[in-house]
C-alpha cells in the first residue's frame, strides 16, 4: 500500500500528460490529414490559449473567461488558416510551409512582446485544481479529469467524422483533395472547420495542462 501511495500520483500525472498531448496530436493530425502539411503554429496556439486565460481572468469572472478563451482560440485558428494558408492554396508546398513557420514565429514573438518573456501565473480554476485523495495518495483533480475528458472528446470527434456531413466532407478531402472539390465539396470551408476544431482541442488541452502547473510560458509547446 505504501508503494502504491508513493507511485500512484506519478502514474496519474503521466496518464494526464498523455491525455494533454493526445488532444494536441489530434489537432495536428486533422490538419495534416487534409493538407498533408504540418501546422507549425499549432503549438503556439496552445501557448496563446494559456496567455489569453491569464489576461482575461484578470478582467472578468472565470465562468465568463473559460468560454471566452475557447471562442478566441478557435477564432485565432480560423484566422491563421484564412490569412496564412488559404491565399497559398495553389502555391508550392514549400511556400505554404514557410508561411506556417512564419505564423509560428509571429505568435511566439507577439507573446514575448506582450509578456516581456516573463512566465505568467495561471489562475486557479475552482474544483478542477483541487487536491483529492485516491487510495491514500494525494493528487490534483485535473489529473483524473484530463484523460476522461480526452476520451470523451475523441469519441465525439469520431462520431463527428463518421456520422455527419461535414465529417464525410473531411474524409473525402483527406482521401482526394481535388476530386472532393470537383464533387462540389466546399474545400475552403472544410479546411477552416478543421483548423477550428484543432484549435478548440488546443484550448481544452491548454486549460488542462496549465491548470496542473499554474504557470504559462510565452513559448510554444514542444
Residue locations for each model-derived region?
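Membrane-interfacial amphipathic/re-entrant helices at transmembrane-helix boundaries
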Residues: 1-23, 52, 63-64, 91-96, ...
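Single transmembrane alpha-helix segments in multi-pass membrane proteins
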Residues: 6-55, 80-89, 95
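Alpha-helical transmembrane segments within multi-pass membrane transporters and channels
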Residues: 60-103, 110
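Generic alpha-helical transmembrane segments of integral inner-membrane proteins
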Residues: 27, 67-75, 79, 106, ...
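Hydrophobic alpha-helical transmembrane segments
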Residues: 44, 48, 63-70, 97-98, ...
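Transmembrane helix-bundle core of multi-pass membrane transporters
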Residues: 87-163, 190
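Helix-loop-helix "hairpin" substructures at the membrane interface of multi-pass membrane proteins
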Residues: 17, 138-212
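Conserved small/polar residues in nucleotide/adenosyl-binding loops
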Residues: 213-219
Amino acid at each position: 500500500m505504501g508503494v502504491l501511495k508513493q507511485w500512484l500520483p506519478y502514474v496519474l500525472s503521466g496518464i494526464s500528460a498523455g491525455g494533454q498531448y493526445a488532444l494536441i496530436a489530434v489537432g495536428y493530425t486533422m490538419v495534416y490529414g487534409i493538407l498533408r502539411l504540418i501546422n507549425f503554429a499549432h503549438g503556439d496556439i496552445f501557448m496563446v490559449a494559456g496567455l489569453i486565460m491569464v489576461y482575461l481572468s484578470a478582467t472578468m469572472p472565470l465562468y465568463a473567461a473559460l468560454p471566452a478563451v475557447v471562442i478566441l482560440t478557435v477564432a485565432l485558428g480560423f484566422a491563421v488558416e484564412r490569412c496564412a494558408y488559404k491565399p497559398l492554396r495553389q502555391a508550392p508546398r514549400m511556400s505554404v510551409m514557410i508561411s506556417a513557420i512564419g505564423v509560428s514565429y509571429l505568435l511566439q514573438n507577439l507573446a514575448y512582446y506582450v509578456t516581456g518573456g516573463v512566465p505568467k501565473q495561471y489562475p486557479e480554476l475552482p474544483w478542477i485544481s483541487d487536491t483529492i485523495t485516491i487510495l491514500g495518495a494525494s493528487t490534483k483533480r485535473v489529473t483524473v479529469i484530463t484523460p476522461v475528458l480526452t476520451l470523451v472528446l475523441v469519441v465525439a470527434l469520431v462520431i463527428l467524422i463518421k456520422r455527419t456531413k461535414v465529417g464525410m466532407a473531411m474524409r473525402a478531402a483527406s482521401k482526394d483533395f481535388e476530386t472532393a472539390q470537383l464533387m462540389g465539396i466546399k474545400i475552403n470551408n472544410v479546411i477552416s472547420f478543421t483548423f477550428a476544431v484543432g484549435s478548440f482541442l488546443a484550448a481544452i488541452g491548454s486549460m488542462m495542462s496549465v491548470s496542473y502547473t499554474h504557470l504559462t510560458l510565452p513559448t510554444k509547446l514542444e
